[in-house]
Design a protein with these regions (language model features):
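N-terminal "arm"/small-domain region of PLP-dependent enzymes with the aminotransferase-like
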Residues: 2-5, 9-66, 162, 194
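PLP-dependent enzyme catalytic core of the Aspartate aminotransferase-like
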Residues: 50-51, 55-59, 63, 86, ...
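Conserved N-terminal alpha-helix of the aminotransferase class I/II PLP-enzyme fold
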Residues: 55-102, 290
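Conserved PLP-anchoring active-site segment centered on the Schiff-base-forming lysine
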Residues: 109-129, 152
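Active-site phosphate-binding strand-loop segment of PLP-dependent enzymes
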Residues: 145-198
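Active-site PLP attachment segment
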Residues: 216-247
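Structural motif of enzymes handling amino- and sulfur-group chemistry
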Residues: 260-279, 285, 289, 294
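Conserved PLP-binding catalytic core of the aspartate aminotransferase-like
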Residues: 284-329, 339, 351-353
Length: 370
């Protein structure tokens, strides 16, 4: 089929994507000269939108390079990389390995693990596309979302595998709910050939002790941290054993063949991590905002965290609501297939700590007027 035919099909299905040109303005974005409250950003703590930490960092670290100019295997890794990895290792009591993005990390590490013979992946139905892309050419099965009984049935019928790697996200970015980590850890104790792979992309910085995530210091074999959301930087890190780190250094193609992160971003991520323990008030405010929006929208909304989903179940309806909200001063993009199942299409809302209660009052009023 020709490209244009495929694009025409997407348009018929109200599923055609276009890139929009915005200008960031704190908790707002400017689009077509209109100032919109931004519900699309993953800047959950408001660090990026405030700019305060960024200014403090730039005043202190003035001589960081803007380019690594090589992969880490070929000399693209100076002191900044090792210092940050050592810092993360001291926090998480395990080894740390930096990658250029969360997508690249998941794709590369899972593709590498897939080369291990007699290994099976069991992935939650709602895991991120980067995880699916990493395991799709391997032995894998999917279990019903957050359904421990369904997962255990799969385990019991596949115990002949030498290793079974269970994959989940600690906080799911579309369903806006949490993985049952404690129950998964119980399964790991029960079945000795299980390993756990947990993506903390949407929880790191904003949840857990000192914002260090929901899997912090738990018996998780592969813990994924990403820095482009609450950390307000870019890149990602794998927290794992020394053996696994050495394996990824040698087998994770996205690490071997990609230019390393810019040193200035590595240093900035390290700087933000060193401040996370100071952000308890921001995290508390974020949770209060989350609870307040649930009260305002009641049965119209799902999500127990700062990520919310207004499920509309139809691409056209989702686009309609998104456009109407934009007219009323809110940027809340529609989420459609294949990102979510057709029945789950709707409006995704990301709250951040730079918002206040009146922002949510205004949003709820606008939503009910549509």
């Amino acid at each position: 089929m020709k490209m244009q035919n495929l694009l025409n099909e997407l348009k018929k299905e109200n599923n055609f994507r276009e890139l929009k040109r915005f200008k960031n303005d704190g908790k707002f974005v400017i689009f077509n000269d209109k100032r919109l409250l931004n519900f699309a950003s993953n800047d959950y703590l408001g660090i990026a939108s405030s700019g305060e930490l960024e200014r403090e960092f730039l005043n202190t670290y003035k001589n960081q390079s803007l380019s690594s100019s090589a992969s880490r295997s070929l000399g693209g890794g100076g002191d900044e990389y090792f210092l940050f990895e050592e810092y993360l290792s001291s926090l998480y009591k395990n080894e740390a390995l930096l990658f250029s993005s969360g997508f690249l990390l998941n794709y590369s590490c899972l593709s590498a693990l897939a080369t291990l013979k007699n290994t099976l992946f069991l992935a939650d139905k709602k895991v991120h596309a980067s995880i699916i892309d990493g395991i799709k050419h391997s032995n894998f099965k999917r279990f019903k979302h957050n359904d421990i009984n369904d997962l255990e049935k799969l385990l019991q019928t596949n115990l002949s595998y030498e290793k079974i790697i269970i994959i989940c996200e600690s906080l799911y970015s579309m369903d806006a709910d949490f993985a049952p980590l404690d129950k998964l850890l119980e399964l790991k104790k029960k079945y000795k050939n299980i390993m756990l792979y947990v993506d903390e992309a949407h929880s790191i910085g904003s949840l857990g002790i000192n914002g260090l995530g929901l899997g912090y210091l738990k018996d998780i074999d592969f813990l994924v941290l990403t820095f482009g959301k609450s950390i307000a930087s870019m890149g990602a890190a794998m927290i794992c054993s020394k053996e696994a780190k050495d394996f990824f250094i040698n087998k994770a193609r996205g690490l071997i063949y990609s230019t390393a992160l810019p040193p200035i971003n590595v240093a900035y991520s390290h700087f933000v991590f060193s401040k996370l323990a100071n952000f308890d008030k921001l995290r508390e405010h974020l949770q209060n905002l989350s609870s307040y929006l649930n009260e305002l929208l009641k049965d119209k909304i799902k999500g127990v965290s700062y990520i919310k989903m207004i499920v509309l179940g139809d691409n056209e309806k989702a686009n309609f609501y998104s456009a109407k909200l934009m007219q009323k001063g809110f940027f809340a993009p529609s989420i459609k297939t294949p990102t979510v199942a057709a029945k789950d299409t709707g409006i995704r809302l990301s709250i951040n700590a730079s918002m206040d209660f009146s922002d949510l009052d205004n949003f709820a009023k606008a939503f009910y007027e549509i």
